[in-house]
């Protein structure tokens, strides 16, 4: 499937503007798990693959799963191994030691779990408390934190800790902020995309600094669980 021009532009906005905003989250999780040489990591919905690159820099063997063809192509441009769907347990040379996912769909998580070894770590992340996140909501979209503990329970995993990470979103200007935030998919539910874009730009003005930059402090939460 060839990505549409719109999908390609949105994917590039994700890779060039937005993806790096989550680096503090990725690094905190890797520190907590002590990711290093010899570890095998599987990243669900890996986007353009920055989280995989950070794991690889620590010596881990990282594989991604990304359904969007445009983002998958960008990740492969970075010479990363990225699949269109979760690997079958029998296809891996050996099971993965850890799985990382940001608010995954239950069916995607369920499909990936068989590839993780028994006792392996499963890390799920999402937005923190609404009062600690400043990313705006507009009609049709915005941050909607999920109950990660319930996701863990329903997936049959064993809880093994949690944490919170400060992830500020900083942008060069309002236009960059709008493009970056739209690339997250948070606002895809808006019935009028152009109107949502205008409302988002308006909602960002209170966070605009005198030099024109935009600063959005946010807290993200992650939970660690183990495959039984």
Task: Place the predicted regions along the sequence by residue.
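Conserved class I S-adenosyl-L-methionine
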Residues: 1-39, 50, 71-74
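Class I SAM-dependent methyltransferase SAM/SAH-binding core
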Residues: 40-91
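Conserved catalytic/acceptor-binding region of the Class I
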Residues: 111-172, 188-192
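Conserved SAM-binding loop
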Residues: 64, 101, 124
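A generic alpha-to-beta junction signature in SAM-dependent methyltransferases
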Residues: 33-35, 56, 109, 116-117, ...
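Conserved Class I S-adenosyl-L-methionine
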Residues: 48-50, 151-228
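A short SAM/SAH-binding and catalytic strip from SAM-dependent methyltransferases
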Residues: 96-110, 128
């Amino acid at each position: 499937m060839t990505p549409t021009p719109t999908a390609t532009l949105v994917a590039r906005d994700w890779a060039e503007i937005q993806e790096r905003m989550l680096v503090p989250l990725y690094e905190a999780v890797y520190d907590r798990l002590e990711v290093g040489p010899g570890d095998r990591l599987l990243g669900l919905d890996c986007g353009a693959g920055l989280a995989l690159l950070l794991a690889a820099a620590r010596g881990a063997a990282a594989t991604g799963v990304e359904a969007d063809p445009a983002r998958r192509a960008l990740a492969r441009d970075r010479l990363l191994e990225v699949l269109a769907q979760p690997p079958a347990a029998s296809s891996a040379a050996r099971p993965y030691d850890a799985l990382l996912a940001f608010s995954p769909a239950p069916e995607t998580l369920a499909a990936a779990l068989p590839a993780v070894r028994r006792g392996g770590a499963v890390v799920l992340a999402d937005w923190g408390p609404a009062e600690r996140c400043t990313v705006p909501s507009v009609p049709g979209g915005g941050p909607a934190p999920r109950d990660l503990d319930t996701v863990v329970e329903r997936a049959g995993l064993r809880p093994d800790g949690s944490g919170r990470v400060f992830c500020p979103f900083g942008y060069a200007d309002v236009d960059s902020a709008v493009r970056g935030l739209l690339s997250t998919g948070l606002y895809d539910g808006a019935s009028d995309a152009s109107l949502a874009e205008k409302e988002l730009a308006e909602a960002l003005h209170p966070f605009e600094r005198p030099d024109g930059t935009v600063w959005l402090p946010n807290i993200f939460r992650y939970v660690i669980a183990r495959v039984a």
